[in-house]
């Protein structure tokens, strides 16, 4: 069984409905996947937040929105950087915000190994 939580839960600092915090689950090694059906941009923000708050290291935080999610949905040709896989990648620049936090800005996108942005 996998634990799937919403990216907005991490970004907001907790559940909007009073349920368990995704960050708390991650802190205890209980978060497998981050997803979002209504704020897809929250996935990148959640990865940055988990790393900046020292809850997960970068590879583990990225895996919650890539490898683990792809594996759980049967998309075995993507989700990690490895020979023979799709090579869907993003390049991100971290921007310092006035409140002391950081925000990820997508600089480049590759789809199936071809740069599209």
What feature does the model see in each segment?
Residues 67, 71, 83-117:
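C-terminal cap of metal-dependent C-N hydrolases
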């Amino acid at each position: 069984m996998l634990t799937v939580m919403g990216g907005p839960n991490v970004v907001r600092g907790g559940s909007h409905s009073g349920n368990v915090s995704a960050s708390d689950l991650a802190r205890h090694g209980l978060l497998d996947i981050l997803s979002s059906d209504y704020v897809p941009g929250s996935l990148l923000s959640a990865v940055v937040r988990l790393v900046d708050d020292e809850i997960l290291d970068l590879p583990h935080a990225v895996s919650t929105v890539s490898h683990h999610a792809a594996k759980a949905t049967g998309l075995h040709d993507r989700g990690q950087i490895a020979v023979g896989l799709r090579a869907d990648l993003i390049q991100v620049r971290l921007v310092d915000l006035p409140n002391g936090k950081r925000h990820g800005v997508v600089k480049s996108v590759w789809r199936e190994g071809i740069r599209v942005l």
